[in-house]
Amino acid sequence: MFGFGSLAHGGLLMQTTEDEPADLSDDTPMTLTEFQDSIRRVLGADLPLGDVTRLSRYGFQARQAERYRDGRILLAGDAAHQFPATGIGINFGMLDAVNLAWKLAAVIAGWAPAGLLDTYHDERHFAGARALLQTQAQVALRRGQDPAAEALRELFRQLLADEQTLRRLGALIAGTSIRYPMPGPGQHALAGTFAPDLTLHTDQGITSVAELMHAARPVLLDLADRRDLREAARDWQPRIDIQTARTDHRPADALLVRPDAHIAWAAATGEPAGTAVPALRGALWSWFGLPRPVQNRSGALERG
């Protein structure tokens, strides 16, 4: 493949892509002769070049750090993973930062539960490994001109005609298809997933899950007027927000949404208080630390 385009300062950017690149490091200097030879192989003809100001090479770089956290050292973005130029993983550096930021803030504020920072590696390393697999698949689809490679590409063209498949692949590329493992038995199917952007009807007007997340705070979203769940969560205020709302397509009675928009816990439709309340308090404890101290009737402080 040969590509070129105009640069803002008036120059031209040219590049070639070959299915069988030389076994050289990206740091190995490229000579003008090498580039002209590559153009000849790709185009089948010589292309006269004027003054060349910069030459570089890049290959299929798909790699990931073994650990995203080692004590006080934390890796994110390109320091944690590198993906080839296929579009997959374009959001992953931002998602690393969003996952890590609220956990660091919790540690600094002093309410982080034990092991909270370790979940950054557990969750984002898993997500990065999936992205690496996807980039390798995309590169495999782009390479090769033999009948087997063409058949594979044709199969994917047919699959992409299906809207559901297209949405799934779009979520893979965006990085929102990840389901993080959540602590506790019998978790709802939504637990660990990226919160759906529901349209919400509240006493203050119409809003959405995405708008609620602008504050980057944990939210207990009560979708079924569950006073028992709201009362159970009050011991964690003002650390978390509690929002009651109605929606046309209710996926659960309530959602506990982390600041990174992943669901920490969900109450099944009609789930009794006997199981929902202790499960909610367990999730709040696991992700947002001990409940705030409350004062008993004698004036002594106790934990809620």
Where are these regions (language model features)?
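Active-site flanking residues adjacent to catalytic metal/cofactor-binding acidic residues
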Residues: 76-77, 95, 221
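Short FAD-binding loop at a beta-strand-to-alpha-helix junction that anchors the flavin cofactor
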Residues: 69-84
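A short, flexible beta-alpha/helix-coil linker loop
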Residues: 19-23, 80-82, 137-138, 262-263
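Glycine-rich phosphate/pyrophosphate-binding beta-alpha loops
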Residues: 81-91, 144
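Conserved FAD/dinucleotide-binding core of flavoprotein oxidoreductases
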Residues: 1-54
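Functional cores that coordinate and move charged inorganic groups
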Residues: 91-104
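Helical substrate-recognition/capping region of FAD-dependent monooxygenase/halogenase enzymes
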Residues: 37-41, 108-304
